[in-house]
Structures are given as C-alpha cells and as structure tokens.
Amino acid sequence: MIWVRQSDDTGGVWFECLPTTAPPDTLLGMVQRGRGAGWLAAVADPVEGRAALLACLTDDPRWDHQVESRAEFYASLAVALEVSAADIAACGDINDEDHWLVAETLTALSVRGDSNARELLAQRIPDTWFEDLMAEPTLPFPPLNAPLSALLGNEHLVSHHDLMHRLRTTTDPDDLAALHEATRDPNRRGFRSAMLALAERGDTSFVTQVGDILAGNPVGQPRAGFLGYLPRLPARDSLPIARLWFGLPDSRDDAALQVLALHATAQDVSAIRARLAVSESTYDQCDLVEALGRVPECGPYPELRTVFTDACYSYLRRESAQALATTDPDFANTFATECLWDCEAGTREVGAKYAPATEQVQRRLAELAADEDEAVRDAARRRLVGPPAR
C-alpha cells in the first residue's frame, strides 16, 4: 500500500492509503487501470483474467473512488469470464466502504439481469440505506423568477442551471446589484456562483483581488470561487494572466493550468511539455494533457502515449485518449480499438469515433449501440453507418 496526498478545489488536504498498482504492461496492471487492453487480455487468458478480476475487487485499485468508473467494466468482465455473483460477493463486505466496489459491481450485474447478484444485495444491504432516498423532499425552493438576492442566499439553488443562465445574461439593475453584493463576502452563499457568472460576463475587475487571494493559498469553500474565476473569463483576458501565473508556487498556478487546458496555443507547448515531464500531480497532469490536445498542429506528442498506458487514474487516460485522437495520426492504429472496452464512457466514445472499421470493431460498436452512456450510444450508432473520424 502507498500513501498519497490528496486535495480538492476547496483547499482541503488529506492523505489516503491507495493500493499498489501493478506495472502497466501486465495483465493485472491493465485490469486495475480499467484499460480496454486489460479487458481483452483477461478474456484471452481466462485463468489469469479471473485472478486479476478478483484481486481488483478484493483490493479496490481506483485512484479516486468517488469518480472513477469500474463497476460496469468489472461486471462485464465477470460475465465474459463466468465469474459468479457469489465469487464477487466473497471479495469483501459490501457494507464496508473499503469494499463498495464489490457492491457496485453486484449492482451492475443485477441490472444486467443476474438474479443471484440481486439476491445477494438484498441480503446484505441494510434497509436503512434507502430510507433517506425514499423520503419526499420538503425543502423550500423559491421560484427562479424571485429576486436574485433571495436565490443567491439559497444553498440548494446557487448552482441551478437556469439560475446560472440568469446570472450570466441578466441586464436588470437590481439583479446586477445583487450579483456584485454576493461577491463581497467569500463565505456567504452564492459567492462562487456570482464570481463565475461575472467572469463569464467578461468582468475583469476582480483579477487583482483573485490573484492576491490565490497567492495566499486559501482553503475552504471560498477557494472554489476564486479558483474558478480566471478560467471562466474570455481567453483574450485569461490567457495572458495564466502565462504569468503558470509555475508559481501557490494556487495561482492551479488557475493557470485550468486556463491552459481550455485555451493553450502553440506559444505554450514548450512550457507545458516541460512541466508534464516532471509533474507528479495527477490533477495537474489532466490539465496539461488537455492543454496539449488544444494544439494539434505541434503534435504528435510521444508523452501522451506514455500517459495513456501508464496512468492509474482513468480520467487521466480519458484525457490522453481525447488528446491523442486530435494530435497523433497513428492513434487509430494504436489505442483507438482498445478504447472501445475502456472503463470510462468518455474513452469509449473516443474509440467509437476513431477505431478502424475492422470486424472486431464493428461487433463491438454493435454492442456499444446499447451502452449505458448516451454519448457512447450515439457515437457507436453513427459509426455503424459511417466512416471513422479524421
């Protein structure tokens, strides 16, 4: 086991014990990472594949348990390898958070129609798990045409899609006054939404304040509002500032990375590649990889292939697949096919768009036409009647 320093947009920091991941070129290492190549290798070697699957379910290999997808990946592999629901349930107590992947995989099997998985879940999950979910919501929600000052004070509405649209587009003087009032106190409800909305409106009046605050490495909820401000500004305003902040030893660098992920140009490539070569932060790597994907004219970038094969974080592999698809002419013949079996929907979607039209790919596209993810389904169905993307 290894201890890894984790953090989030609010500035929270903690240390988490993560499983040791096998080398990326081994069957176990690929199955742990959720790679399509791992799924295919496991099916080709059922004995080793079964052992790898059960090892992953016993010792959850995910770098981020909250967001990384594995349950459907492991459930489909269990079906292909004829691993029973009982074998999966034996990998850990599903009421122990260290083994929630077992419960998630059993759930994925039950959705596929496995009655044994459904019965095992019913036996082991306490009824109290569902009591809060079944309760009728009773929170008071003001109508979205209410005064903006009232809406920004409601913690359950501050990120509502329609409210954010109103914040971005309103010309009402009272609304604008309420919007600016909400930025006065970083600890008040609505602060983050107000800051993001003003940035999207092109209001650059907070740049100096945001830079000063981020230089002090703020923590807690206010950090998210300050950190999200610069990336929401138009590129003409944010990119010059991001280039100045890039590499600074404080939270300004985090904001700069987010801007480069959205708006990098050829001018930024050398600095991005140099940073990617030495970066040990998975979240930073995600932004750096996405930034390279914005500049296909300077590619291909060999380091993106290494990120694709080695990344333990499946979101990072998804970002590298998307970047490779636009920057590497050989992507269709190297990684695109395995992407069709990847654990992450975004990576499967990339594969559906770019994989060559082989018999194996056509069969897999027919399966993905019924994928759980709508974007994957749409991409697969388009490919079944059309050529790969270029």
List each model region and its residues.
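Structural detector for internal amphipathic alpha-helices that build alpha-solenoid repeat scaffolds
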Residues: 1-20, 28-51, 55, 62-83, ...
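HEAT/HEAT-like alpha-solenoid repeats
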Residues: 332, 343-346, 375
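Core helices of alpha-solenoid repeat scaffolds
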Residues: 24, 50, 173-176, 207, ...
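A generic membrane alpha-helix/interface feature
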Residues: 362, 375-376
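TPR/TPR-like (Sel1-like) alpha-helical repeat modules
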Residues: 122-126, 366-372
